[in-house]
């Protein structure tokens, strides 16, 4: 599934290197910003003549909306992708999407991703054996 092998991993990497990493790695930031931009272009073309990714509303739209909604934190300009922007606005207007995006919002607000205690939970953990 395209979201699982493309948009999710690439957007996740740009979020990591752009917003959470303890050191600035310009090459990594630019690489993933550009790859997400390319993937947004693919979605924009796909949405040129249809309201949803697969034509009708489907799990494909549900899986992608959370990632595309983070366009600003991914270093993207949604206005470069008018079909994708229309799709995102349509998705965000759906009652079920609104409810889903509201879940846990209070838990996500105010978290400092640069706080060493937060980063200790997120990074440099290894599997323990034995």
Predicted regions span which residues?
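GST-like fold's C-terminal all-alpha helical module
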Residues: 3-100, 129-130
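Acidic/histidine-enriched, glycine/proline-rich intrinsically disordered or flexible terminal extensions
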Residues: 105-130
